[in-house]
């Protein structure tokens, strides 16, 4: 602990005879706190001064201690020791002590004794501490000089005594008076610039020049705090007011509420005097130590948000793949103009180039998917503009990450359902100009597709490649789009989660794409209803999601258009190769009410061109097959073997449909007992099941399957319960008893009175 003034600086050597020069700051403070008796402190002068030259002759003076006659202090020529006797204080000590102490030779032994009064007296007056000089009565000029020196040093200690106790016995709450003087100029730099707030949430800012109060006062409160200081204002330049200070008084008046404070500040024209209180935390000084480290630290120094890190990695991969794809597109475009006589050489070059591209993309992108338009033949793609060959870069999520949409509490909006993951069943290929190079590209595309499609399809990240089949009762076939619009937006983790949670049930926007802006008909059968509610709580009109295909033209024209497009565009060996378009919303297993869409760079208007393959046209022409064929999972072809089945936990065998649909299907299945089978393999002769919505204790809802209740039996049980005779027996103890309890004798009297009353009534009727 150091005691500093203008001329001298003393360091503490001992406390009650215990050497603290080797202790740390915290341990020295604890020694002060643990001292319950009279505190004796030995100090040493640390600085040289010109007065030392005048004290050479007094080096052999021996000065005794009056208060502690039993303690003998040995004073040598190389040390100047003193004692400060003060009452032990009980206040909390927050003392920034000095570092390692240095012994500096001095020529004068000095003994000082300071007696300090109570803490309240010290706050009332700075001169409250009494001073005593304990010296020997030795006649001589040197001793008188020593007395003058002692008086000077003691005066300096008394002058800075409040500073000493602020350092060592700092109070928990600091009270300070601050005077802010306004300027004459009417500018923003001459404003007080305090933003005050009370116990309410809303804040108000005071402009002291014009007297205008900006903001609203929420409520009256006794406690008014400073919530902020405006930059380049009077309070900001003063530097004494901090955020969190409580304003106790203004211009000598107690602050009652926020409105009164703002009024007083607005009325003051020259200066404002504020009395503020501030809570002092003892650990503030420890926070200034730059070498301080936590023993058990969980976060690294360079810790940032994990989501932001993933986004940065994603954008880096996207940029590298864009350059790679642009380079390959330019080189493949040059190969188109090679003469036919050099076609064999060009094929070899293109194939080697494609292999290099595949190797580079496999190494550089483990999380990014390169997906160009794969369904068009290379001859047809040669005639398309280069802008339509942009790649679609998508983000791959972890295979173990299962994402399920929750059921919203709002009954007016269409609920989002959990659905089992569906595997990829179709072959795709990277669109390159050489048929030789398309084979390894197909394998790469298929491998990447298997890894990325399972979870990302429910977040709207990429389309799902699947066969045309129906998995739900009464649902239309998935729409097949020949041409895929490209997407310029990179779906990062943060933006994807935000778009998923903010998706609405009013449908998705569509846009026209490229040169083929042909709006085709509805893919549903002619006799199919447009209702898209396939939930377990179908309430009729509550599902108001707009169907994206309600603006259809003549179905015959749509069929003709689909056939024409199929005959002109599909020219590849894989006749059944069909790719999805626009977004995953067209392939959701819940029909036409998709909800998550993708943005596209060249989709200017509100509708997208939709062209159907031959499979989609056949589904339009032929009516829906029987329920048994709809519910049965059709066998897969050879292409299915490349895609392993991915079984999602707990939901892989469930298809969420409405209870009315299940009841209707069960009724139909009873009439078709030959080959009737349900989704889970139960026979139609068993008890029919319906979906029920259950509620957990935490408020969340889930769907379970329960047997259909027999309504006549329920009504019969209710009637039997209501027709029971009311008694006081134990079998009806659960019923509510109203009225007093009559004893057995009283009930007998009641029966007799009733009997007499009936007898009297019969007599009157006979007369």
Curated annotation (Swiss-Prot):
SUPFAM superfamilies, per database record: PDZ domain-like (SSF50156)
Gene that encodes the chain: Slip1
Sequence ranges assigned to domain PDZ in this UniProt record: 202-280
Name used for this protein in its record: Slo-interacting protein 1
Comp. bias regions, Polar residues: 532-555
Subunit structure: Interacts with Slo.
Function according to Swiss-Prot or TrEMBL: May selectively reduce calcium-activated potassium channel (Slo) currents by reducing the number of Slo channels in the plasma membrane.
UniProt cross-references to PANTHER family, sorted A to Z: PDZ DOMAIN CONTAINING RING FINGER PROTEIN 3, 4, SLO-INTERACTING PROTEIN 1
A Pfam family assignment: PDZ
């Amino acid at each position: 602990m150091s005691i500093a003034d203008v001329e001298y600086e003393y360091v503490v050597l001992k406390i009650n005879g215990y050497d603290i020069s080797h202790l740390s700051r915290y341990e020295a403070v604890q020694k002060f706190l643990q001292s319950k008796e009279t505190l004796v402190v030995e100090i040493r002068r640390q600085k040289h001064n010109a007065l030392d030259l005048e004290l050479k002759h007094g080096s052999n003076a021996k000065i005794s201690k009056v208060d502690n006659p039993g303690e003998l202090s040995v004073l040598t020529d190389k040390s100047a020791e003193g004692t400060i006797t003060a009452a032990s204080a009980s206040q909390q000590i927050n003392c920034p002590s000095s570092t390692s102490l240095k012994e500096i030779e001095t020529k004068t032994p000095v003994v000082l004794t300071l007696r300090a009064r109570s803490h309240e007296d010290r706050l009332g007056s700075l001169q409250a501490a009494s001073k005593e000089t304990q010296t020997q009565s030795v006649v001589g000029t040197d001793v008188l000089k020593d007395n003058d020196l002692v008086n000077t040093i003691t005066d300096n200690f008394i002058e800075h005594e409040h500073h000493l106790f602020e350092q060592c016995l700092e109070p928990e709450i600091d009270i300070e008076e601050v005077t802010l003087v306004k300027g004459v100029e009417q500018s923003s730099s001459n404003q007080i610039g305090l933003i005050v707030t009370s116990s309410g949430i809303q804040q108000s800012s005071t402009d002291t020049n014009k007297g205008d109060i900006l903001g609203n006062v929420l409520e009256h409160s006794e406690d008014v705090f400073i919530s902020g200081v405006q930059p380049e204002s009077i309070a900001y330049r003063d530097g004494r007011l901090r955020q969190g200070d409580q304003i106790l008084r203004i211009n000598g008046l107690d602050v009652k509420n926020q409105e009164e404070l703002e009024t007083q500040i607005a009325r003051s024209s020259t200066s404002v005097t504020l009395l503020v209180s501030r809570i002092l935390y003892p650990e503030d000084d420890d926070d200034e130590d730059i070498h301080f480290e936590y023993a058990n630290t969980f976060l690294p120094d360079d810790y940032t948000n994990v989501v932001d890190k993933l986004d940065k990695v994603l954008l880096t991969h996207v940029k590298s793949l864009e350059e790679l794809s642009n380079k390959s597109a330019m080189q493949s475009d040059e190969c188109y103009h090679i003469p036919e006589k050099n076609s064999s050489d060009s094929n070899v070059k293109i194939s080697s180039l494609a292999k290099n591209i595949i190797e580079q993309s496999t190494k550089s992108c483990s999380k990014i998917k390169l997906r160009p338009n794969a369904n068009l033949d290379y001859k047809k793609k040669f005639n398309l503009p280069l802008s339509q060959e942009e790649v679609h870069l998508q983000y791959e999520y972890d295979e173990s990450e299962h994402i399920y949409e929750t059921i919203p509490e709002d009954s007016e909006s269409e609920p989002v359902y959990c659905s089992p993951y569906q595997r990829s069943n179709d072959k795709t290929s990277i669109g390159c100009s050489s048929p030789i190079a398309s084979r390894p590209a197909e394998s790469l595309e298929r491998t990447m597709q298997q890894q990325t499609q399972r979870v990302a399809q429910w977040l709207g990240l990429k389309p799902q490649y699947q066969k045309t089949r129906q998995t739900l009762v009464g649902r239309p076939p998935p729409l097949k789009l020949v041409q895929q619009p490209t997407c310029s937006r990179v779906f990062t983790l943060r933006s994807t989660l935000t778009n998923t949670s903010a998706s609405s049930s009013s449908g998705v926007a569509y846009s026209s794409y490229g040169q083929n802006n042909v709006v085709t008909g509805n893919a549903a059968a002619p006799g199919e209803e447009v209702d898209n509610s396939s939930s377990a709580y179908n309430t009729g009109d509550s599902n108001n999601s707009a169907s994206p295909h309600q603006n259809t033209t003549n179905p015959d024209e749509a069929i003709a258009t689909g056939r024409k497009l199929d005959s002109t565009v599909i020219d590849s060996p894989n006749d059944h190769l069909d790719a999805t378009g626009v977004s995953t919303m067209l392939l959701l297993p819940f029909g036409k009410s998709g909800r998550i869409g993708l943005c596209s760079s060249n989709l200017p208007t509100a509708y997208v061109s939709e062209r159907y393959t031959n499979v989609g046209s056949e589904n339009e022409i032929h009516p829906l097959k029987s329920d048994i064929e709809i519910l049965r999972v059709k066998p897969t072809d050879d292409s299915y073997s490349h895609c392993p089945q991915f079984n999602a936990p707990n939901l892989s065998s469930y298809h969420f449909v409405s209870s009315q649909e299940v009841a209707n299907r069960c009724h139909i299945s009873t009439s078709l007992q030959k080959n009737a089978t349900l989704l889970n393999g139960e026979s139609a002769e068993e008890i029919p099941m319906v979906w029920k919505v259950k509620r957990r204790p935490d408020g969340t809802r889930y769907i379970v399957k329960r047997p259909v209740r027999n309504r006549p039996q329920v009504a019969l049980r209710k009637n039997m319960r209501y027709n029971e005779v009311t008694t006081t027996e134990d079998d009806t103890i659960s019923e509510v008893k109203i009225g007093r309890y009559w004893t057995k004798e009283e009930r007998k009297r009641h029966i007799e009175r009733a009997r007499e009353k009936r007898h009297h009534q019969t007599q009157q009727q006979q007369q």
